[in-house]
Amino acid sequence: MRLLLLSVFLAACSATSSAPAPAVTAAAPPAAADSTDLPNAVATETLTPTPIRVTVDDLPEPYASESARKGPDVVDVPASPVLRVPAGFAVQVWADGLDSPRWLALAPDGSVLLAASRENTILRLQDADGDGVAEARETFATAANGLDLPMGMAFADGAFFVGNTGDVRRYPYAPGQGRLEGTGTVVAELPGRGYNQHWTRNVVASPDGDSLYVTVGSETNVDPEELPRASVFRITPDGAGRQTVSFGLRNPVGLAFHPATGTPYTTVNERDLLGDGLVPDYLTSIGLDADGEPRFYGWPYTYLTPDNLDPRRLDGGRSERPDLAARTVTPDVLFESHSAALGLDFYPTGATRAGGAATFPARYHGGAFVAFRGSWNRDEGTGYKVAFAPFEDGRAVGHYEDFLTGFLVDPSGPTTWGRPVGVLVLPDGSLLVTEEANGRIYRVSYVG
């Protein structure tokens, strides 16, 4: 598999206190700053962006290597950590001392919601004084509000929605509301839990607010399953009109709409135990085909093309489902196998200076940022970083680049002090990145 390397990005910032955090208030516009002026700054080294292109033609045969089971050895944050980002970017610790922070959502009032999924808690945070550190922190919802491994969060139709592992719930919401009330109304029942980490359920509102898109991962590695497993479907905000958008997606997690085209995209964790080089995770658009049928992306019968048959799903040397195998769509951007691609967000198109803060250079506008949580099913560890996938004219170019790296200490272990999960572009043009292992949120900003 050929890999070329390109990197771009990261800044982070953090705040902890033994005293109760102040209530969230309206944020002041942040002022542009040199990285040396930023509070909670993380030391950085310059990373030179280089394209990484994984193609179907480069893939090895199944079982070309052993399938290792090497989960990471997660260590504490170093006393003097150093992260690598492209020139001109700075990193701060935006928030610290968190319990397994996973997913992020921007509330209508500008505050940031954080799903600490394993704690069945959603926090509400904000950088009220605009210095790049979230000093305001309060509890927005807990298990008492019906949370059960919450992840995706969305706002639509004057309401707040959360994706639990077993359902999607709707709650009354008013901008600026500091805490959810009640246990909400279930608008979609879902199959709960799943294989390894496949309990995550993302929920995102369409740009027009008329639909909610929901992701559901598989329950197994490669066993055939009934929908809605391994699919993305959509419903109206009141739960009606369920329609499968795409399926054969082993574990779709990240979900976002391109800012220029409105096309939905998802990140997918592909299957295990075929060797180090199979199967690449990916970023792809989703939707209906020319016949109005949901697109099929291969799982569990094929991978990436109709010709790549999974050897575990054969019958007499042929695919168990030749009808579906023939429909397999090739994804837009392939990632190195076992990277564990999770969080996804697009940088706005036509972004300019916002509130006096320098936004990212034009080459990032309309492109996708993806968090790689990192491998467990590979001899040499991979992932543990944030990548950037360039787009041109609203379409993926086909390669990706490293944007924020430095967490992975030793790939042979692997040993790491960071497992990025969620990403969120803020109105000021900076990027937030959740790091689950050591309980931080990093902020990446462009300081020129």
State where each predicted segment sits:
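A short beta-strand motif characteristic of beta-propeller blades
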Residues: V91-D96, R137-A143, T185-R193, G241-S246, ...
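Asp-box/WD-like beta-propeller blade repeats and closely related beta-sheet repeat scaffolds
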Residues: A136-A154, T165-P207, T215-S218, G241
